[in-house]
Amino acid sequence: MGFLTLFHMAFLAVSLFVSGALAAFGYTTSGNNFVIDAGSANPLIFSVSKSSCDINSIRYRGTELQYSKQGSHIGSGLGKATVSVSQINGSKSKFIKVTCVTSTLTQYMIVKEADSTIYMATYITAEPAIGELRFIARLLSDKLPYEYPYGEVSTTKGSSSTVEGSDVFVVNGQTRSKFYSSTRFIDEDSHCVYGGSDLTHVCIITPQQESSSGGPFFRDIDSNNAGESTNLYNYMNSGHVQTEDRRMGLHGPYLMTFSRSGIPKLKTVDISWFGELGVTGYVPDSQRGTVIGRATGIPSGFEGVVHWYNAAAQYWVRTAPNGDFTSPKMKPGTYTMVLYQTEFKVATSTVTVSAGKTTTASIASTFNTSHTTLFKIGEYDGQPTGFRNADKFLRMHPSDSRMSSWGPLTYTVGSSSLNDFPMAVFKSVNNPVTIKFNLGSAPSQATTLRIATTLSFAGARPQVVVNGWSAPAPAAPAKIDSRGVTRGAYRGYGEVYDVAVPAGKLISGTNTITISALSGSSGATFLSPNFIFDAVELFY
């Protein structure tokens, strides 16, 4: 072999090394894949299948992060899609746009020059056949083993047994599930998986969830180290304790960002350029409206939240300390407007939003507290706050050994602590809950026992017995066909039951009330019919 041939081979090797090491914004074709290079200082290069839209390779700073046995994709993969790629010269930046089209779904993946982020949006005209809409990044667990912000509660790698279904496991004596990674929509910032000597973070950020379902307090799976792969999700809708119909249209934009300089924050995200890219269903701020106003009647110690929704979109905002609020930019339309006392619904009205206009619409709590209270257990906040195991159930199964005893428990008014009252009553575990209280004299009039709940499973509702008198059985609540508390969920329809206690049923001295989970259904232990408490109050 001649000297010149060796020289040319060496030159070619160096050239290939340099081209791989230095970022070159753009896209190329390699076999059945489009290869997109973000041209970022920390190089991000990923490959998208021309036939399925699967992301089948993600190289960040020269390290492969994509799980090889399954791609990153919408749902469980689109199967077949028409996939195209183009470069767009925007007003301030250049972009690469990948577009994947099926008969009912269009997936967009967008890269902005010099930005190690994959911006995405999903447009649908029908719910996917699998019954949920999600993006899942399947990443290498040996490269990205850790999860943020809740850590190992959703790491199911190394499980020794299954507790429930195929999604709650035991790892080192602790119950773990992907469901325990969830965060309320209103609290979402970034959720990440991370690892490596240079501490690479891969994070999902959702600037808004206007086309998702469930409202501000809905929560769903965010991440899961499942062993072979570490999975990072953006759940846009699902059947996981879902309380409203799925919304069609554009979901997003949302983004998967790659960082070696810490955890990116939502407040730093700029998507003002998104309207330049020809994304179907995208509504720019100029075609949106705003609602301003003041929420009143929220007591001190509770958070005020205003929520707007219709069949096309949903929005929310926390109120200022004085109750003032300004909505996000909203699509035009007529909305139901709800005021929450933390998560407890206290007012409902309607408002119409017009493009390019600001609408003033204040809202006041209609929750009536003008009565004489004999006792109250908990607060009307739409959560099981303070009750036994309420501090644990979001991140572990009710059967976990770290849980306090579920009972059956007896709560004595005036001497028991709030932790002596269970957050939930299960038909086959801690039925009934007993309340004991003393009255100096018997009320001469009828009283009301109000039981505020947050979520019912398998038709459970409260059956009340007062000093041996059985109250009429309430009607079954609206069915939510999903496991709840065992998956760390507590937010349902929030049924409130007012039990009319006739005069003469309460006595001077010691009184006893029992509250049982009533249901025609059955189930074993923590999958037996159950409901979650918000507050219990006796008043006249």
Swiss-Prot record:
Q: Name one GO cellular component term.
A: extracellular region
Instruction: Please give the start and end residues of each transmembrane region.
Output: none
Give the superkingdom in one word: Eukaryota
Entry's Gene Ontology BP terms: cell wall organization; pectin catabolic process
Whether Glycoprotein counts among this entry's keywords is yes
This protein's record includes keyword Protease: no
Pfam short name (any one): fn3_3
Signal peptide residues are 1-23
Carbohydrate-modified residues: 89, 368
- The EC number(s) this enzyme carries: 4.2.2.23
* Keywords for the protein's UniProt record, in alphabetical order: Carbohydrate metabolism, Cell wall biogenesis/degradation, Disulfide bond, Glycoprotein, Lyase, Polysaccharide degradation, Secreted, Signal
Q: What top-level class of enzyme does the UniProt entry assign?
A: lyase
Name the cystine pairs. Answer: 53-100, 192-203
Gene3D superfamilies membership: 2.70.98.10, Carboxypeptidase-like, regulatory domain (2.60.40.1120), Galactose-binding domain-like (2.60.120.260)
Q: What does this protein do?
A: Could be a pectinolytic enzyme that hydrolyzes the alpha-L-rhamnopyranosyl-(1,4)-alpha-D-galacturonopyranosyl glycosidic linkage by beta-elimination, thereby generating oligosaccharides terminating at the non-reducing end with a hex-4-enopyranosyluronic acid residue.
What family classification does the UniProt entry report for this protein? Belongs to the polysaccharide lyase 4 family.
Task: Spell out the protein name for this chain.
Answer: Putative rhamnogalacturonase
To which species is this protein native?
Neurospora crassa (strain ATCC 24698 / 74-OR23-1A / CBS 708.71 / DSM 1257 / FGSC 987)
Q: What is the lineage of its organism?
A: Eukaryota, Fungi, Dikarya, Ascomycota, Pezizomycotina
State the gene name recorded for this protein: asd-1
